[in-house]
Amino acid sequence: DELNRYSDLETRRTQDLRETRRGIRAAQQRVTNSEKEENRLTDVIARLERARREALARGAATARATITTASLGTLPWPVDGNLLYRFGPAPGPDNTEITWHGVGIGSAVGAPVRAVASGTVVDVGERGTYLTTVILQHGGGYYTIYATLSDATVHLGDPVVAGEVIGHVGGASTDQGSHLHFEIRGPDQIALDPLNWLQKKQP
C-alpha cells in the first residue's frame, strides 16, 4: 500500500545516504594516505641528500650531474600517455582536494617506464598508495620519482642510462586508473613541476 511504498522509499534514501557518506569518507582517507606518502617520500629524499652531501664532504668522487637547470624543457617523457593530473592543488574524488607534487600520466598497464636521465637507483620498493616506486639520483641534488608501477626492473645501487626501462605502469586500482605518477625533486628536496622540465608535447 501507499504507506509501505513511502517506507521503502525512505529506507532506500537512508541506505543511499549512508553509502554516499561511506564513499566520501573512503575518498578522504585515500587523499590523506596519498599526502602521507608524499611526506614519506620527502623524508626519504632528505635522507638520501644528507648522505650524498656527507659523501661530498668526505671527498668522495661524484659523477657529473645529469639534470641541471639547463635541462628545463628538454627531458624525454618517462612513458607514452596522456596527462591525467598536473602539479599543484587539484580536485580529488568526491569533492576532496589533493595537492600533487608531480604529474600523472595515463597509460596502459604494463607500458614501459623509462629513466628521463642517467642516474643511480637509490630507492626501490613498495610505498603504500604509490605502489612500487623507483627513485633515481642524478647528482646536484636532483632526483626523479617513478610511482604506481606494476613492477621495477632495476635494483638498489644500479646505474641507469637515459631511456632505460626501469619498470612498468601499474595503478589500475587507483582512482585515476592505470598511470605513472612522476616527480622531480630539486635541491633542498623541493618538488618541481615536471611539465617545466619535460619536452613540450605537440598539440
Where are these regions (language model features)?
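Alpha-helical oligomerization segments with coiled-coil/rod-like character
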Residues: 1-70
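Catalytic cores of peptidoglycan-degrading enzymes
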Residues: 72-203
